[in-house]
Structures are given as structure tokens and as C-alpha cells.
Amino acid sequence: MFQTAIGVTIPFPEKVREGYRIMDGALRASVSFEKLDAVIREFISLIEEPMFLALHIPLPEGATEDMSVYGEGTGSVYEQVMYLDQCSREQMLSVYNTFGGIFLADGVSQFAIASHKSGDEMFVQLFKIVDFLGEGRLRYTALLEKHGIYPSDGLLTAWDVLDKEHPGKCRLVKVLGTTIFDAVERLKEFGLYAAGVIER
């Protein structure tokens, strides 16, 4: 059965399937949670240096411990977009080794890893839906298929099973006593900075 992060709950998880589809401007993938870490690590190994990390962090008043989400693009949560720029591969792996556990488990935040040089980006969104972005996005079909994730014209992601009668739930969680907000404060010591506020 499709696995989800501990910070999210979806209705009818039995309906959700792994797979990917090509969309306008994005390669979208539904990745079961137990595979997501390996896919991210391999993406880091493939993209060109230098790299950057982007974090989308809900403002505290929007980060409830049980936030209902009805589907893609719904909700009225504002989030702070933050960046850690000009990372080498070694530096990005160090950041991910330290904070990847909370990035993956948390339900209320989103994150992306990308190349400054090529623009290739892996954006891990709410419910851990993955979008590969950039002109080279289609090359990552091979990465997905290596992990048993194949094209699907009728792909059902977590977003596709949500509605107002059956919302998903996104939660702020702790991993080893650390929340995403704690991780942000620690990453500021390494150069993480705020770039602006957007509405989710």
C-alpha cells in the first residue's frame, strides 16, 4: 500500500498509486514515502553544482497541528519562502543528512533542491507530491523508473482524492525533538535567508 509521511493523513490511501505524469512545465510524481529519501539523494548526486535549498515554511499562525487541506491550491495559509544558496554537493548532502528527516516527516512545510546552473529542481510539496521542474526535467524519468515509479496516464496522487467532504490533514511534527521551525533557526547559522511571503 502507498505509504505517507507521519505528518500527513489522506482519505482513501488505497486509491493512491505510485507513478508519474508529464504536465505543462512539470514532471509530477507520486512517490511512496519509503522511496522518497533515496530518490532525493540520487537527485542531489545528479544535478550540477552549485545548488540551493528552498524552504516554504507556514507562518506560525497558519501552522496548526492539524491543518485541513481540500486539494491542490486550496487553503489560505501564508508561507515564508527561504533559501540557502551556493551549496556544493557535499554541503547539500550535509544539510540533507542533518535535516532531511524533519523535511520528510513534517506535514505543513514544503522544500525544494535545485541547481543554480541548470535550473533543474525537485520540489517536494504538501502530501509529498513531487514536481521536477526546469528545462531538463524529463531526464529524471529514468531516476523514477530506477525506483519502480513508472508513467501513468490515470495517475491518482494524494491531491486527487481530497475534497471538502474528505480533506487531507497536515501536521506539524517533531523528529528527535526538532520541528521544522527549529530546523530553520539552525539553518540560519549557515546562511538560510528569507526571500518573501506567498499565499499557498
Which residue stretches match the model-derived regions?
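Structured alpha/beta or helical-core interaction and ligand-binding surfaces enriched in interleaved
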Residues: 1-129, 133-200
